[in-house]
Amino acid sequence: MTQEELLKRRPVWEAMSDLFLDTETRWAVPHAARRCADSLYDDEALERIFWAEVFPEAIENLLQVAGDWGMLTLSEPALIKRANHGTIPWLTRRAHGWMVQDSWLATRQVTAWLREFPLDERVQRTKALDLLGRRYFEPPGNACLVASPERVAEVLTIAREEWARYEPVCRAMLGDDETSMPAEGCAAAVRKMLGI
């Protein structure tokens, strides 16, 4: 792997690794998607990077009793080795891929959307999607700590535009065991925040 390729790959590895934290990772989807879109890797390359390089290094964090929840430090030499010669570990993916599958599919979908926009506009779109996701996945009845009036006002127009296509993505990431967060209640909290 050349130094140029390594510089291009590092932000993608880091963003993808956020989907393996032992915390609420669905909030990371817009930021991971932006890094993927900015990288200029095509979908096939991103799929390989995720499953053949990052997944084998990062999945252990979700298999621990108390994994890292702030930031994963992945072995760069191992990532480089996998990038040069690795294959997708099908057995491990089959056994544990479900733990990150929904977030990864959402990341791929949002990556495709963000590619439609110039780099400077992607930042604002990412902020809007982040706000929408944080409000959506906040437990019912909780105040959304990141939805300050200033932050909402900054991205309100974009958030209203994006909500129609981001809501199904968020709904698809709700787990079967999240009965305390019915999809309609989550969506209602977002609509209230957006004033729609």
Enumerate the predicted regions with their spans.
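Amphipathic alpha-helical repeat scaffolds
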Residues: 16-17
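Short hydrophobic "helix-edge" motifs at membrane interfaces and signal-peptide entry regions
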Residues: 11-13
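Intrinsically disordered, low-complexity proline/glycine-rich segments
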Residues: 27-30
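Small-residue-enriched hydrophobic alpha-helices in membranes
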Residues: 1-8, 32-196
